[in-house]
């Protein structure tokens, strides 16, 4: 009897070890499958095959509970496909999941700008700035909207203010110079474009302006 009992114990232990091994292998295969899924999605995006890249992660983007990163990446791939309404909806879903996400809030601006919804994009950008006052990307996207709607006074003041926080940045100086040029402040625009050349020697727009206004 003792011998039989010992055999039964050994069998049960072996069964438990096999079950643990099987579970470990299942987890390993699942992790590998997910890694392959992401790798393939990035590979397809690199080839410009955005719909296929999105299809790779669709099960994660639509699952419950929500997968935040999959939602944001799916929104980005929708945007690249030109599916702007869908992209905005997915960015909003990501934002509903994590209201502190600056990335999702910035993402909302992209489809709005692509649809020339400048006022909406500015409003979205200001929501970002309410939480992160000197977020560079939000400021630049708002400047794009200000330029698109010919708000030259606003753009000049805005670019000047942000440029003081990022004094080595050429992009901000370009927007500031464009605003001053549109306001016919040629001398100031030339000074700003000259600063652009200091930061980016040979900058095409700055070089052209300086030559045309000699």
Task: Identify what each model region corresponds to.
Residues 31-69:
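N-terminal leader/linker segments that initiate helical-solenoid repeat arrays
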Residues 46-47, 80-81, 114-115, 148-149, ...:
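Register position in tetratricopeptide repeats
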Residues 59-60, 93-94, 127-128, 161-162, ...:
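Canonical positions in the second alpha-helix
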Residues 63, 97, 130-131, 164-166, ...:
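Structural marker of alpha-solenoid helical repeat scaffolds
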């Amino acid at each position: 009897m003792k011998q039989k009992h010992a055999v039964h114990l050994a069998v049960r232990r072996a069964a438990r070890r096999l079950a643990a091994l099987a579970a470990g292998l299942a987890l390993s295969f699942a992790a590998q499958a997910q890694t392959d899924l992401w790798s393939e999605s990035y590979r397809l995006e690199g080839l410009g095959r955005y719909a296929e890249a999105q299809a790779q992660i669709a099960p994660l983007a639509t699952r419950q509970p929500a997968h935040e990163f999959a939602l944001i990446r799916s929104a980005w791939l929708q945007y690249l496909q030109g599916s702007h309404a869908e992209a905005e909806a997915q960015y909003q879903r990501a934002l509903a999941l994590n209201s502190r996400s600056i990335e999702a809030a910035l993402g909302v601006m992209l489809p709005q700008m692509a649809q020339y919804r400048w006022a909406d994009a500015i409003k979205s950008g200001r929501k970002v700035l309410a939480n992160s006052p000197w977020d560079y990307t939000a400021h630049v996207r708002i400047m794009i909207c200000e330029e698109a709607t010919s708000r030259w006074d606003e753009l000049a003041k805005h670019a000047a203010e942000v440029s003081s926080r990022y004094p080595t940045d050429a992009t901000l100086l370009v927007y500031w110079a464009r605003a001053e040029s549109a306001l016919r402040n040629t001398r100031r625009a030339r000074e700003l474009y000259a600063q652009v050349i200091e930061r980016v020697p040979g900058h095409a727009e700055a070089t052209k302006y300086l030559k045309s206004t000699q």
